[in-house]
Amino acid sequence: MKRRLFLMAAAALTLPSLALAHGPTRQKITVTAEVAADPAEVWAAIGNFQDMSWHPAVHSTTGEGDNAIDATRQLVLGAEGGPTIDEVLYKYSTEKMSYSYRITEVKVEVLPVTNYSSHLTVKPRDGGGSLVEWRGAFYRGYPNNDPPEELNDAAAIAAVTGVYQAGLDALVERFGAPGS
C-alpha cells in the first residue's frame, strides 16, 4: 500500500513538469491580395515554379524539373551571391492555379523558420480581378524551449509575413488594385 501511495505521489509531482516541457508549436499564416487583372494573367506571372522574378526580394531563380512534382529551385536573395533558399515542389495544378512547396534548406539567419511549407493560389475575385492567397505553416527557427528573440515564434511569423506581403504588394503594383 505504501508503495502504491509513493508511486501516485511521484506521478502527481511529475505530471505538472511534463506540461512545461513542450517544444514549439506549428505556426500558420495566410496573406491575401486583391489585384485588378484576371486570374489567368496573374497565374501567367507567378505560376511557374522556376521563376520568382515577380518577387522583389528574389535576385534570381535556378532549378530543375519545371513544374513537375519534386522539381527543385534555388532562390538567390538580394543580389548576386546573396543568401539562398532551396525549395522543392510537392503539388502543382494549372487548373486550380495553385502550387505547394517546402523549403529543404535555408539558414535561420536568412529566414528564422524550420519545417516550412507553403501554398500559393490565384482565384477569381467577386466583382472581377483576382484574389492571390499565400499561406504557410512552419516552426520557429529555434527548436528548443526559451528561444532567443530572433528565433522565436514572433520572429518567424514576422519574417514569413514580410516575405508574403512584399510579394503580394509587388503584384498589386504590377497589376493594380481592383477599382483603381
Regions from the PLM with identified roles:
Residues 3-7:
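N-terminal export leaders
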Residues 34, 51-57, 61-111, 169-179:
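Glycine-rich portal/gate segments that line the openings of hydrophobic small-molecule binding cavities
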Residues 91, 122-126:
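Short, low-complexity Ser/Thr-rich regulatory SLiMs
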Residues 18-68:
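Hydrophobic ligand-binding cavity/cleft-lining segments
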Residues 8-9, 14, 19:
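Cleavable N-terminal signal peptides
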Residues 28-30, 83-87, 113-119:
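Short, surface-exposed coil-to-beta transition loops
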Residues 131, 138-180:
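A conserved amphipathic terminal alpha-helix motif
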Residues 104-108, 135-142:
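Short, solvent-exposed aromatic-acidic interface loops
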